[in-house]
Amino acid sequence: MTDRYAVFGNPISHSKSPFIHGQFAAPTQESLTYEAILAPVDGFEASLTAFFNAGGKGANVTVPFKEQAFALCDSISPEAKLAGAVNTLSLLADGTIRGDNTDGLGLVADLIANLGSLQDQRVLLIGAGGAARGCILPLLNAEIAQLTISNRTHTKAQLLVDIFTSVDNGAYASKVTAVEMSELAGEFDIIINSTSASLAGELPPLPAHIITTQTVCYDMMYGASITAFNQWALSQGAAKVIDGLGMLVGQAAKSFTLWRGIEPDTQVVLTLLRDKLMAEPK
């Protein structure tokens, strides 16, 4: 019997997930299908329920339904709990729904694939929205030395700090801080842009001096050409820039493993996806 999986979103026609999961499944002999489902903005729960009632086994969730998906779960992972959102749903044998958030796990996996261990790295996270929030616990669990969060609206960055410094009786309190963009100083080993500014060809208002010849810059956005943030980082002398395509493949791989118990080959699929992206009409 073929197991059904899907990604829910609105819009969803642009989704790379069906291609990615199809490539994951191909060499494993796993019998499954994976489709993109456009859910009405006010009809996500009904669409998801219909999918599960028709035999669906699991689903990915993207904008704008991640918070709604969180509310529908009977159980959630630690990453999902702290993110306040889920991107992966699993229908369990007892009929309950488990929610996971694999976004941050995908980011960390891609960083490690490119850089090796993240232990003792000083990380600057730009942005304080859902993308940033979902990545904080996985970054901290990767044993980084320090996480600085900076956002145009400083109160949002401080709110994230308050959430994560209260976790595990303050276990992370000394590792997470919020700093105004205009007051950023010192050196960072890794700078991560979690904002969508690059999609509009724009940049966060960052001081150039935070980038050194040792700094690696990571933009969660991606495209056929270099992103605006990464182009700026190179112009300021960054040692290396990475876009978010590997994070996309990485989070999908974590979902696939949760559902199938198999770890797919992400590098092969990333190469195929990069080639596919480059071949798309500009």
Curated annotation (Swiss-Prot):
The keyword tRNA-binding does not apply. GO terms for cellular component: cytosol. NADP(+) binds at G127, A128, G129, G130, A131, N151, R152, T153, H154, T155, K156, M220, G244. It comes from the Bacteria. Homodimer. NCBIfam families: aroE, PRK00258.1-2. This is Shikimate dehydrogenase (NADP(+)). It comes from Shewanella baltica (strain OS223). The lineage of its organism: Bacteria, Pseudomonadati, Pseudomonadota, Gammaproteobacteria, Alteromonadales.
